[in-house]
Amino acid sequence: MGLPQNKLSFFCFFFLVSVLTLAPLAFSEIFLEEHFEGGWKSRWVLSDWKRNEGKAGTFKHTAGKWPGDPDNKGIQTYNDAKHYAISAKIPEFSNKNRTLVVQYSVKIEQDIECGGAYIKLLSGYVNQKQFGGDTPYSLMFGPDICGTQTKKLHVIVSYQGQNYPIKKDLQCETDKLNHFYTFILRPDASYSVLVDNKEREFGSMYTDWDILPPRKIKVKNAKKPEDWDDREYIDDPNDVKPEGFDSIPREIPDRKAKEPEDWDEEENGLWEPPKIPNSAYKGPWKAKRIKNPNYKGKWKNPWIDNPEFEDDPDLYVLKSIKYAGIEVWQVKAGSIFDNILICDDPAYARSIVDDYFAQHRESEKELFAEAEKERKAREDEEARIAREEGERRRKERDHRYGDRRRRYKRPNPRDYMDDYHDEL
């Protein structure tokens, strides 16, 4: 027996909605999704770069000091003043005719002082055991901090073998909580940079990187045409100065003033009332201002097509990607990298960030606040002990020097003089 008509219609509707909802996911492609769960060491190769010099650091698999989820572990830089390099090989792909999404999370738990927390996409063959700072890359993206002044968010792309940093001044987060950084590059060469799913910057590779010459340039030595009227307002030609306007005095005699009773005309002359401001005086006459009907706007140097510009429709296309890597140097270690995603679906990347914040953000903040409270109490106690120790040492020093002064006190010559005078 078949389904009733109304149930069959509902089933068809539900099936259609499901297909439409899942269709984008079915056609999206994930090239790398790494949450550093079991077996991650088999996927990632720790480089020996700088190891012979004793300058190579190691990574620790941990959730950190204030994890939103203690079971969600990443890899943390572990040794101070070291170079870190680790990479994973991924199925080779090209972003030609597709959107590229690069996303990861990093929690900079430490007072880093100076160091990077970015990731790189690599092309061609890479000896992963020798992967280091001089290894060519196709994209470098993420925070770089040094002191209190530099809090830069790098977006560096490689074009024809040369690296080009973004011209805009992008800032990274420094509050010791977990943050997601997302870079989206589209086939029309437009891009977006997101931090925690909030768009921090957007634009075009044509304008925000100095890769190609600009499409338009200003005309050199251009001059404003003589008939160009850039006066937005002009005097009203129909406004006429009232008759007698210029004869109105600025001040007039005070009519309420009275001659003093003791005024002596022979001695002081004829009394005159003091002057007061004239309320009828309007100052110099000025015609009313009206909109200029011939106003053409402020003159600007005209733009023309740049003869040196040659378009590259593949400007957005990176060399085929084969590896993802972390290569940084840090004065103070302690940054946790996690949730690395390389795909072509911005919606899927957004869902990962949304899920993390919905499930773990509040607990992470609570643990961080508690850790900060304990740190503050510990520092206050250490400061108290240091003050008490300093006071104790000061008292000992004063006591010791006091005894020495009394022991080696020099006689006062006046004492001898007094004895001499007494004898006299």
From Swiss-Prot:
Keywords: Calcium, Chaperone, Disulfide bond, Endoplasmic reticulum, Glycoprotein, Lectin, Metal-binding, Repeat, Signal, Zinc. Changing G203D: In crt3-7; loss of response to the PAMP elf18, but no effect on the response to PAMP flg22. Residues 228-237 have a biased composition (Acidic residues). PANTHER family: CALRETICULIN AND CALNEXIN, CALRETICULIN-3. Belongs to the calreticulin family. Can be divided into a N-terminal globular domain, a proline-rich P-domain forming an elongated arm-like structure and a C-terminal acidic domain. The P-domain binds one molecule of calcium with high affinity, whereas the acidic C-domain binds multiple calcium ions with low affinity. The interaction with glycans occurs through a binding site in the globular lectin domain. Residues 238-260, 368-401, 412-424 have a biased composition (Basic and acidic residues). It comes from Arabidopsis thaliana (Mouse-ear cress). This is Calreticulin-3. Changing G115D: In crt3-3; loss of response to the PAMP elf18, but no effect on the response to PAMP flg22. Residues 1-28 form the signal peptide. Glycans are attached at N97. Changing P67L: In psl1-1; no effect on EFR accumulation, but decreased response to the PAMP elf18. Residues 269-307 are annotated as: 3 X approximate repeats.
